[in-house]
Each structure stands twice: as C-alpha cells, then as structure tokens.
Amino acid sequence: MRVDLFDFDLPEENIALRPANPRDSARLLVVDPNENRMEDHRVFDLPSFLRPGDALVFNDTRVIPAQLEGVRLREGAPETAVSATLHMRADQSRWKAFARPGKRIKEGDRIRFGYDRDTVNSSSGACGLAHLEATVEEKGEEGEITLLFDISGPVLDEAIASVGHIPLPPYIAAKRPEDQQDQTDYQTIYAREKGAVAAPTAGLHFTPDLFEALDSAGIERHFVTLHVGAGTFLPVKSDDTDDHKMHFEIGYVSQETADRLNAVKARGGRIVCVGTTSLRLIESAATEDGTIHPWSDATGIFITPGYRFRAVDMLMTNFHLPKSTLFMLVSAFCGLETMRDAYRHAIETGYRFYSYGDSSLLFRKN
C-alpha cells in the first residue's frame, strides 16, 4: 500500500509533553467499526467496556536509561561528541544502537560514554563522571551500529544505568529536556523486566485504583514482555509499505501465560491487548487457528491493512504519528477509513497525542 494513505495533519498543540494526572483521567476514544460507534470517555471508564472473563494483556518491560552521550576516540583525530540510543541487546557485551551523527562514526572507532556534549571541549572534561567504553564493531543502515562494550553482564547493566538517560521520544525531546519527573512518568506501574528503550505507552494510563476496578469487574490480567526498541521512533521512508523493513525486538510469552490466554478464548472471553507492543507479540506467538504458544525470540512483525488477526480481539492504544507503522497497525485492526475518521475527531476535539497523550479502545473489525 502507498504510505501516503496513512498521512494526516496534526497540529503541534495536540502533542502532549506531560501525562495526565492522575494517569487514568486521560481521555479514551472508544471505536467499534462493527457498530459504527465512536464515543468519548475517560480511561477510568475502561471496565464498563469489558466483560467478566475478558483478559487484559500487558507488556511488563521496564525502560532502561538507554540514551548514552559520549565522545568518539580515533587515533589522529580530535575527540568528537556523539550519542547512541541502545535498542536491542545482542549478547552479554553487545548492543545494537542508533548513533548520531552517524556520519562521524566508522567501524573500529572507540566511544567513551559518560561525557556530556557540553563537556567535550571544556578544560575539565568529564572528570568525576563514570565512564563506559565500547568499540564500534559493525555499522549498518540508518545510523545503526553494533557496540562491543569492554564489560559485560550485570556489570555492564550497572554502568549503563550510571551514565545513561531515559530516551524520551524525539517529539518530546525536541521540546524539552528529560527531567526527574520523567523517571516516574515514563514507566508503567507494573514495569519489572529491564530492557526497553521506549515505554509501552498505553500502559502508562493504569493506576492501582483502575486495577482494583478491573479486578472487581472480573477482568483477568496477564503479562508478557516485549523489549521496545528505538526503531519504534523511526519514520517510514519508503513510498510503499512493502518496501519498509521493521527492526526486531526481543519478546517473551511464558507457557503459563499462553495456556491461560488460550483458556480465556476457549471460554468465550476476549483478548484485550494494552498497547501495540503486546498485540504484536501475541500475534507473533499465535498460529493461524488462534492458538497462542510460548515465545522466546525476536519479532519483526509488520501489520498493515489486509493482515488477518489471529488472537487479539480488542486493543487499547495511544494516538500515533502520521505515516507510522503503528498507525498502519490500528488501520489494519479497525479499517483505514474508520481510523482516519477517529483521528480527525480526536484532533478536532482536542485529544492529546503520542507517548504522554490520551488513549483509544479499539474493537477489531469483523
């Protein structure tokens, strides 16, 4: 399909720079293409749209401080400021990352992280800061590099935590710097498995009170893990969806969770994914007959209109970028024209977009 079919105009004022407070007071646009229904609600109304025996599927990944600032070290060349956003762990000492500016980096370069951009040319340098060094082992397309760190395992994790920053989405980072409030705001309350570069943002709306209301309504809660990579922020540069290449992300669905979700389906309950990351993982783990299997692997699933959904019945998700793979996904779920109408309504009525914005509850188109 032509990528420009998924384009729309989004005013700057619709982009959220901070989340709603409390989290579950965010707006919720309910869209059911099968009944031609579009209604404005709040996230705390979610239980009223679910039935006893339905199951919510959450992504319990935890955002790590994957934004690293440093300097390139090359013999015979001056130190040059660079940054790297880690996006997928390759092994205990290697990470794939997106480097900026990519043209300043080549294979074999050394990078010392722990330097702030502002200290590169200062006389005091980065004295007193923790340091972390790596070799650029491989350079790929779109600024992607493979970093081989000098340390590995938990020691490497601790070093990244020491020198790294939370990698806010570009459309927020362009407006303001990351601050202490983001340390809390950009994590779900149930985040536990470290490894994401971006938050599974639909989950940011949940509160203990909302969990209690869902429990009282007889709604099951299940957790899977997909470590969201920085590729989620990359624009689609091709003119046709067939030419776009997705970046892979590591995910896990346990045998116990797969069994419980299959039992929900067998009883007539619905699988309700909280976020596109949960949906992409469940659809990766499901076979054509809708059976969900355990999963421990990378997925690069790219869902566009025409895709036949295997297991997921409903989706809660925030509002996405024009021409993004995620807007393509929701268009596959509900129909392109339905989602164009929904986004037009959202923009006209002041819904807040993107990671810190409002949310939607989508029913899969029959």
Swiss-Prot record:
Entry's Gene Ontology BP terms: queuosine biosynthetic process; tRNA wobble guanine modification
Main location: cytoplasm
Keyword Ion transport annotated: no
Compartmental location: Cytoplasm
Entry keyword Cytoplasm: yes
GO molecular function, one term: S-adenosylmethionine:tRNA ribosyltransferase-isomerase activity
Pathway(s) the chain acts in: tRNA modification; tRNA-queuosine biosynthesis
InterPro entries for this protein: QueA, QueA_dom1, QueA_dom2, QueA_sf
Reaction catalysis annotation: 7-aminomethyl-7-carbaguanosine(34) in tRNA + S-adenosyl-L-methionine = epoxyqueuosine(34) in tRNA + adenine + L-methionine + 2 H(+)
Keywords: Cytoplasm, Queuosine biosynthesis, S-adenosyl-L-methionine, Transferase
Function: Transfers and isomerizes the ribose moiety from AdoMet to the 7-aminomethyl group of 7-deazaguanine (preQ1-tRNA) to give epoxyqueuosine (oQ-tRNA).
Subunit structure as annotated in this protein's UniProt entry: Monomer.
NCBIfam families referenced in this protein's UniProt entry, alphabetically: PRK00147.1, queA
Family: Belongs to the QueA family.
HAMAP family reported for this sequence: QueA
Name of the protein: S-adenosylmethionine:tRNA ribosyltransferase-isomerase
Species, as recorded: Agrobacterium fabrum (strain C58 / ATCC 33970) (Agrobacterium tumefaciens (strain C58))
Gene that this polypeptide is encoded by: queA
